Amino acid sequence: MASVSAIGVLKVPPASTSNSTGKATEAVPTRTLSFSSSVTSSDDKISLKSTVSRLCKSVVRRNPIIVSPKAVSDSQNSQTCLDPDASSSVLGIILGGGAGTRLYPLTKKRAKPAVPLGANYRLIDIPVSNCLNSNISKIYVLTQFNSASLNRHLSRAYASNMGGYKNEGFVEVLAAQQSPENPNWFQGTADAVRQYLWLFEEHNVLEYLILAGDHLYRMDYEKFIQAHRETDADITVAALPMDEQRATAFGLMKIDEEGRIIEFAEKPKGEHLKAMKVDTTILGLDDQRAKEMPFIASMGIYVVSRDVMLDLLRNQFPGANDFGSEVIPGATSLGLRVQAYLYDGYWEDIGTIEAFYNANLGITKKPVPDFSFYDRSAPIYTQPRYLPPSKMLDADVTDSVIGEGCVIKNCKIHHSVVGLRSCISEGAIIEDSLLMGADYYETATEKSLLSAKGSVPIGIGKNSHIKRAIIDKNARIGDNVKIINSDNVQEAARETDGYFIKSGIVTVIKDALIPTGTVI
């Protein structure tokens, strides 16, 4: 996203919307600033920066009641009035989540944000990429469970001088730690941030951007932050429009005519659910879509002004552990300005095996996937691995995504996602499945030794059939194995046998061995 210093012409549009009293505010005449980036001196850039800031503040002063606009994730027509050096004024804080029990066994040996996604990526790449695409390059990731692989991935994927040495960008993991002042591990999202406030306040920023590490979506945080500043909010909560069917599974919010949050309800039902209906046209939906989506749910994504965050966590709610259920409703009760900001794009909370499975298979959807990794205007970044192209020999592959470095021989793959370095042998059938691949290749010598010992190499063996399953990394699936859940078992824990079944989806554990001839 271009900074102001890289834009040749900046137009500040007239503002003539009505305020809450019904009186039209004074229109601000359109002003155009023109300059050439190739000849603009350093002093001129500083002057331009301050001029843009004054113009933006002028618009806000004359228009005190501004409702945050509809946020469309792939919109190309936005113009923000953010500080050109946005990365220095916002600190990104990504919450890595707890033990990830609902995603077990995928979280058996890794933190939830480190779970592989979409053949080439990991979950953590989504919020980090959204930050980088929004010119936010100072990012912390808070975690306390199995953080080794997450730390390794981040150190390899994101350079220590992101954004250039001037911006001092970084992506750094902060693991839970005990100290004489606080002997406890993280007790929740708010407590995790509280324990590292001493570090966060060292950064001279205006806002903290609080993000979740297990969501799949593409969002322009610059628009989010712009709306926070324009409404003079203390806290801004990203909100997702909901229909009645889905609304009962989320924490809902009620807003007034200015988009200010006045009430919260956790997974309401019946009459309580009906009472949470809102006019979502206030936040930018058209009349038809507002009728279909009369509820707004919190996405667990917040912009919090720096001083407000410090006061809430240290003074107002020193014992609160969670943002969504304690701190944010508490801030509303104190009379702070807590605004809703509508995000009307694809969003998925990847907190369960079923949600994770559906999100991955969703990228194979025709003609347009639920989430696209092919948007060059807002790319998803990850670790460069320098793997060779995938090799497919007499393979029949349809409606699938194949990662880098795979070797696929004379097999059938349909509606599946195949991860890095996957090896699939002759006669295998892969349907409606997610294969995470492998961390390394085995040599021919190693495979011969395994065969001599009666063991199985990494990958999918000959004539094996995999259907509606997740195969974690480095799994060894023997020949003539059937993982098809023909009995339609919904829940089963067979950890000693190398697999679990959740919501009818078979998940083979990382590094597991499924012997030749096994039927699941």
Curated annotation (Swiss-Prot):
Phylogenetic classification of the source organism:
Eukaryota, Viridiplantae, Streptophyta, Embryophyta, Tracheophyta
**Does the record's keyword annotation contain Phosphoprotein?**
no
Pfam families annotated for this entry? LbH_GLGC, NTP_transferase
Q: What is its EC number?
A: 2.7.7.27
Keyword Nucleotidyltransferase assigned to the entry: answer is yes
The chain's transit peptide is found over: 1-71
Any one Gene Ontology MF annotation carried by this entry is: ATP binding
Q: What does this protein do?
A: This protein plays a role in synthesis of starch. It catalyzes the synthesis of the activated glycosyl donor, ADP-glucose from Glc-1-P and ATP.
Question: Which body tissues produce this protein?
Answer: Leaves.
| Keywords for this protein | Allosteric enzyme, ATP-binding, Chloroplast, Nucleotide-binding, Nucleotidyltransferase, Plastid, Starch biosynthesis, Transferase, Transit peptide
Q: How is its activity regulated?
A: Activated by 3'phosphoglycerate, inhibited by orthophosphate. Allosteric regulation.
Query: What's the protein name?
Result: Glucose-1-phosphate adenylyltransferase small subunit, chloroplastic
NCBIfam families given in the database record: glgC, PRK02862.1
> What GO biological process terms are annotated to this protein in UniProt?
glycogen biosynthetic process; photoperiodism, flowering; starch biosynthetic process
User: What gene is this protein a product of?
Assistant: APS1
* Organism the protein comes from: Arabidopsis thaliana
Subcellular location as annotated: Plastid, Chloroplast
